[in-house]
């Protein structure tokens, strides 16, 4: 989709957009039956939950499922590099899978199929949409969005060099924030001492 966007000084800028559904494959996870011990005992496949998405790269997990649990449930094995996006309860948390793993149904797995989009760019773009997704999330007891809504999210298409530049800037900002947070924590400890 192409839209016109008013730019500075009255010039019109042409901006091209795509949707997640057009440029990515999107799947939701699943939970093997808890009543079947053979789906969980001696498992060797990492199973990711919302609480495991704590940073950009996700490689920590609390539970493992078995091959039998994977094959007899709606769980799907996601490859390293898959973007994880929470769609139930805690909406809009984003991470990039740093291992091969499965997720529960509260997490969508997004694999980019369009060479015009980089993983890091989509990660930061989705991260910037957290307030938006929390506003559109609807639920009786807990907020949620469905996969159709996620697939309809529009992504601005800019050239890959600009995407890489944006990512580089945002990564520098994140590093600076981490350093400042550590300094604040260190000062808090000093005050308490």
Locate the predicted segments by residue.
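Histidine kinase transmitter module recognition
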Residues: 113, 125, 176-179, 183
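A generic structural signal for residues embedded in beta-strands
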Residues: 85-86
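A specific heptad-register position in long alpha-helical coiled-coils used by two-component signaling proteins
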Residues: 171-174
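Non-catalytic DNA-recognition/assembly elements of restriction-modification systems
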Residues: 1-30, 55, 152-160, 164-167, ...
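Basic, amphipathic alpha-helical recognition segments used for DNA target recognition
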Residues: 18-25, 54-60, 76-80, 96-102, ...
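DNA target-recognition patches
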Residues: 17, 21-24, 34-69
């Amino acid at each position: 989709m192409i839209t016109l966007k008013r730019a500075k000084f009255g010039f019109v800028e042409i901006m091209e957009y795509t949707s997640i559904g057009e440029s990515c494959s999107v799947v939701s996870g699943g939970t093997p039956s808890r009543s079947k011990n053979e789906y969980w005992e001696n498992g060797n496949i990492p199973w990711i939950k919302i609480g495991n998405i704590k940073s950009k790269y996700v490689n920590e997990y609390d539970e493992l499922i078995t091959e039998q649990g994977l094959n007899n449930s709606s769980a799907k094995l996601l490859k390293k590099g898959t973007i994880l996006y929470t769609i139930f309860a805690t909406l809009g948390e984003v991470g990039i899978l740093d291992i091969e793993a499965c997720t529960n149904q509260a997490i969508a797995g997004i694999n980019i199929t369009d060479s015009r989009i980089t993983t890091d760019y989509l990660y930061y773009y989705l991260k910037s949409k957290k307030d938006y997704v929390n506003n559109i999330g609807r639920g009786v007891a807990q907020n949620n969005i469905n996969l159709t809504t996620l697939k309809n999210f529009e992504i601005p298409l800019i050239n890959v060099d600009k995407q890489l530049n944006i990512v580089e800037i945002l990564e520098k900002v994140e590093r600076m924030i981490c350093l400042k947070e550590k300094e604040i924590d260190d000062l808090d400890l000093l005050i308490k001492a």
